[in-house]
Swiss-Prot record:
HAMAP family in the record: Ribosomal_eS8
GO BP annotations, alphabetical order: translation
Assembly and binders: Part of the 30S ribosomal subunit.
A family per Pfam: Ribosomal_S8e
UniProt keyword terms in alphabetical order: Ribonucleoprotein, Ribosomal protein
UniProt feature coiled coil, ranges: none
InterPro entries: Ribosomal_eS8 (IPR001047), Ribosomal_eS8_CS (IPR018283), Ribosomal_protein_eS8_arc (IPR020919), Ribosomal_Se8/biogenesis_NSA2 (IPR022309)
Protein name, per record: Small ribosomal subunit protein eS8
Length: 125
């Protein structure tokens, strides 16, 4: 079943809204890409205007920026420590923007959107 991101058909009062147009392709959404910890796996998605996005399904490395040294290194991710989006994501090792991960260098917060960017960028805490 598809995800429709257009206007609802009912008003807050319960009255019916008349549609201005039928459903259009640009109003379609998709299921969220829940990036998990594991061997790297990408999926290419066609986006608006014929462009493409890369959804990261699984990954075990992150580009971690160290603000003290002002250097970036590719390091291995150990586990997911904290996720403000959903506490159950920690148990399932799901990573998204704002997730705190444990790496070889220490704890880091993810700054990219892995489900849409195709990479995991993070900043050391």
């Amino acid at each position: 079943m598809t995800i429709f991101q257009g206007r609802a058909t009912r008003k807050p009062s319960g009255g019916k809204l008349r549609p201005n147009h039928s459903k259009r392709r640009y109003e379609l959404g998709r299921e969220p890409t829940l990036t998990r910890l594991g061997d790297r796996e990408l999926r290419k998605i066609r986006s608006y205007g014929g462009n493409s996005k890369f959804a990261l399904l699984r990954c075990d490395y992150a580009n971690v920026y160290n603000p003290k040294d002002k250097t970036t290194r590719k390091v291995k991710i150990n586990t997911v420590k904290e996720n403000s989006a959903d506490p159950h994501y920690v148990q399932r090792n799901i990573m998204n923007r704002g997730t705190v991960i444990s790496t070889e260098l220490g704890d880091a917060r993810i700054t990219s959107r892995p489900g849409q960017d195709g990479v995991i960028n993070a900043v050391l805490l």
